[in-house]
Amino acid sequence: MPRYCIVNADDFGYSKGVNYGILEAFQNGVVTSATLMANMPAAEHAARLAKDHPELGVGIHFVLTCGRPLADVPSLVNENGEFPRRGEALVGARRGDIERELCAQLERFFSFGLTPTHIDSHHHVHEHPNVFPVVEQLAERYRLPIRPVRTARPHRLPTVDVFFPDFYGDGLTKDRFISLIDRIGDGQTAEVMCHPAYIDVPLASGSSYCQQRVEELAVLTDPTLVAEMAERGVQLITYREFYKL
């Protein structure tokens, strides 16, 4: 039986360096999909790249722990009007603020002339018990698949069979990537999360995960990787194709 894999690059829109790294991993590597941070400074730049490359599947990367909100959501921000990076505001956040902000991010995504292929989130905040009900409602309204949820209550939203968040950190290699691919069972669809990028000033000043992104990019664009996946009978797809399986 065929096996399918979506290789999704998170943080599209974080900075131009991130955007160009993701594009490189798509054009010359195994990345098939990306998720866009609608509240970040390079979101519009990412959207232009996406429209220029329609084969790249682009979903929405909901953000509640990075940058500034698009809506007036006082229970979600700190004294500087920014989302706290560790997500501590989510515990006491008002449901209405979460709804307003996620709707605002989705509306901005649509304003770019794009339709999201799926939903995931920065730092996996869609798994938070105060956030998931809102995400579930939006996913049902727009009929969008979501990245698998490991901690929220059971749901009926479409999602892949296997999610690999562990192509992340120091010392990543092609063998590490292949070891994940080898865990996809017959007839299953998997998603591998990744964060390729080129380092630029916004990334270096805003993220502690920088050099590792360049290392990820090198692995994801290894010229032998596509062939090795094909030899294993793994087909690269996006969430668009997944929804039709």
Swiss-Prot record:
Keyword tags: Carbohydrate metabolism, Hydrolase, Magnesium, Metal-binding
> What residue range is the signal peptide?
none
What are its cofactors?
A: Mg(2+)
Keyword Magnesium assigned to the entry: answer is yes
What organism does the record attribute this protein to? Answer: Geobacillus stearothermophilus
Cited Pfam families: YdjC (PF04794)
| A GO biological-process term | polysaccharide catabolic process
Q: Which domain of life is it from?
A: Bacteria
Read off the CDD domains from this record. YdjC_EF3048_like
Q: What does this protein do?
A: Probably catalyzes the deacetylation of acetylated carbohydrates an important step in the degradation of oligosaccharides.
Write out the similarity annotation. Belongs to the YdjC deacetylase family.
Its top-level enzyme class, in one word, is: hydrolase
Q: According to the UniProt entry, what is the EC number of this protein?
A: 3.5.1.-
Q: Which InterPro entries match?
A: COD_ChbG_bac, Glyco_hydro/deAcase_b/a-brl, YdjC-like
Q: Which HAMAP family match?
A: COD
Quote one Gene Ontology molecular function term. metal ion binding
> Know the name of this protein?
Carbohydrate deacetylase
Positions bound to Mg(2+): H61, H122
